[in-house]
Amino acid sequence: MTEHNEDPQIERVADDAADEEAVTEPLATESKDEPAEHPEFEGPRRRARRERAERRAAQARATAIEQARRAAKRRARGQIVSEQNPAKPAARGVVRGLKALLATVVLAVVGIGLGLALYFTPAMSAREIVIIGIGAVSREEVLDAARVRPATPLLQIDTQQVADRVATIRRVASARVQRQYPSALRITIVERVPVVVKDFSDGPHLFDRDGVDFATDPPPPALPYFDVDNPGPSDPTTKAALQVLTALHPEVASQVGRIAAPSVASITLTLADGRVVIWGTTDRCEEKAEKLAALLTQPGRTYDVSSPDLPTVK
C-alpha cells in the first residue's frame, strides 16, 4: 500500500530511514532444524516447503519495510514542519503581548471615558450642601463664603479652595469640605471659642485661645478681661498670658476676672472677688497651677506662685 499527495522531501527521508531499518532484518528464514541442501537433491515436497518459507519471509520483509517507512515518514514530517516553522513559539509570545497591550489600551480608554462622564454629568452634581458645626455662624454666611454654584458636578469642585474660603469667616477656626456621592457637598466647620475679652473704642473684642480677635460683641458672662497692650496671635505677651490661662484648673479659671501681662515676665491674675495672683513667667506653668489650686483654699489677699518651690499667701 502506498500514500499519495505527500511532500517529496518527506518521501525521500522516509525511504532512506526505511532502507536503513530494513537492512537490519534477517533475510534467511530457513528452519534451523532442517539443514540446507543443494536444490538438485531436493524432492518436490521439500522444494514446495522451501518456496512457501521464502514467500513468507519476503512478505514479512515487505511488511517490515512498509511499517518502517511509515514510521520514518511520520518522524520526518514532524521534523520538517518544525524546521519550516522555527519561530512559532516566539510568534505566540508576540500575539500574547499584543493582546495584553490591546486590553490595557481598552481599559485605559474606558477609564478615561468614565472619568470624563463623571466629571461632566449632572447626575453627580452638588444638588445639596450639608453644613455641620454652625452656631454663631449662620448657614448663609457659610454658603456666601463657599461660593459653590448649585448643580455643579462634584468632581469639578475644588474642596480645598472651598474650605479655604469658608475659613476666612472670622468666627471659623477651621473648615473641611467633602464630596458625598451621588449629589451632596458636606462642609464641616469649627467655630472659635472666646476665652478673653478686651475693650476697644468700638466695643469689646473677643479673643480665642490662639489670640485671634474674631468678633466685636458683648462678652459671655464671667469671661475674663484681657490687659495687654497689643493683643494678637503673634504678640509674645498675648501668647504668655493665654498660656497661663489655659494651664489653670477649671475651678480656678472660672474665678479669674482679669489677666494682665505688661511683659512676659510679670503676669498677674485678678480673681472676681478681688484677690490677686502673682504668677511671674510662663516657666513651670503646670506646677504653678497645682500650687495655686491648693493655696486658694487658704484665706488671704495676695497669692504668689512666681516661685513654685516657695509659694506664699499674704
From Swiss-Prot:
Q: Could you tell me which PANTHER family the record lists for this protein?
A: CELL DIVISION PROTEIN DIVIB, CELL DIVISION PROTEIN FTSQ
Which stretches of sequence are listed as region Disordered?
1-57
Organism lineage reads as: Bacteria, Bacillati, Actinomycetota, Actinomycetes, Mycobacteriales
Spell out the protein name for this chain.
Answer: Cell division protein FtsQ
Q: Keywords assigned by UniProt? A: Acetylation, Cell cycle, Cell division, Cell membrane, Membrane, Transmembrane, Transmembrane helix
Q: Which PROSITE patterns match?
A: POTRA
Q: Provide the POTRA domain boundaries.
A: 124-192
Assigned protein family: Belongs to the FtsQ/DivIB family. FtsQ subfamily.
What functional role does this protein have?
A: Essential cell division protein.
Q: Which GO terms describe its cellular component?
A: cell division site; cytosol; plasma membrane
Q: Where is the composition biased (Basic and acidic residues)?
A: 1-15, 30-57
**In which compartments does the protein localize?**
Cell membrane
